[in-house]
Amino acid sequence: MRKYAYLKNPQKCNDKEYIYKIMLHTHKEGVYLYEYCSLDAIICSYDQLYFDVSDIYEDWNSEIDERGWIDIDDPLPEN
């Protein structure tokens, strides 16, 4: 499963960069959260590994905009 979301307000991640959108990706190792420092970025700037998707929702649901989580297809089958 993959879902992405845009943040209501950019989140500062260091002295120069802000996170504008995020994507979650469930994997056999856990759930990856990819963080993008540009609205049109296709390659993430940062990532985090969570044990459960509910932890991502708990951390991020209040930060995403009114469009909510948007489902997208997995580009490749998981090995």
Q: How should each PLM-predicted stretch be described?
A:
Residues 16-19, 28, 50, 61:
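Low-complexity, intrinsically disordered short peptide segments enriched in small/polar/basic residues
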Residues 39-79:
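Mixed-charge, Lys/Arg-enriched low-complexity segments
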Residues 19-44:
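Short aromatic-glycine-(Arg/Gly/Cys) micro-motifs in beta-strand/loop hairpins
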Residues 1-16, 75:
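Negatively charged, low-complexity tracts enriched in Asp/Glu with abundant Ser/Thr
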